[in-house]
Amino acid sequence: QHGLLSMDDQPQWRVIRSGATQYLEAFERQFKGTIKLQTPVRQIQRVDGFVRVVTDNADAAFDAVILACHSDQALALLEQPSLLEQQLLGAMRYKTSRVVLHSDPSFMPARRSLWSSWNAQMYELDGPATLSFWMNRIQSIRGQDFFLTLNPLTTPRQIWADRKYAHPIFDNAALQAQSRLKDLDGEGGVFFCGSYWGWGLHEDGFTSGVGAAERVQAALQGQTSLLSE
């Protein structure tokens, strides 16, 4: 767990030097298969013992497919989702968050000595709060200050990037579904992974992806591909 909401027993955080893109580039260097960019998948079909991936350009058949995306996106891709897939994947809700990279210090504590990696800001005691990350401290960046703010209540000055992302909401329904996700994995050759298997963090997505790859390997162990016949 990230420990953001607790004051005691804070975990020791570590970051990947030069940012999270480093592990994506490392995967790309080691991956022996083919990576197709700008090829959005429109539908996943389970037909005659294999899985068909439908894109705008062509269809391709596979022995197994891993849907490494948000649970609601995975559910929308399935041509004929099972009742269990509808129940578990559909139980996860998502919230769209605005994420702004900027250099506006007004989103930080007035005293610089109080700046930390994560900083919460509230205008009213019972009002909404914004969370700002001090990227210089997190990524050991020298020089100009850079901050990453989630859902800023006011528009920051000196914006470098302004994006919207969907984050899972871990309510009671989501946590109950999360405990049963392993029950739907592998049905008809379709496997699932994503940060929603954990707490929505990069580490959760990575761990989930490795687990899905291992489950595919175990499921296909000793089998002859139907596509080679």
What are these regions (language model features)?
Residues 31-32, 62-63, 187:
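Short, well-ordered alpha-helix to beta-strand connector turns
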Residues 1-45:
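Active-site/ligand-binding neighborhood in enzyme catalytic cores
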Residues 18-25, 72, 207-210:
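A structural signal for well-ordered alpha-helical segments within the folded catalytic domains
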Residues 127-229:
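Conserved flavin/dinucleotide-binding core of flavoenzymes
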Residues 35-37, 67, 192:
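A structural signal for the hydrophobic beta-strands that form the central parallel beta-sheet
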Residues 27, 51, 56-58, 181-186:
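A short acidic-Thr-Gly-centered motif at the start of a beta-strand
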Residues 39-168:
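Mid-domain catalytic core of redox enzymes
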Residues 30, 80, 215, 219:
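Active-site catalytic microenvironments for nucleophilic, acid-base chemistry
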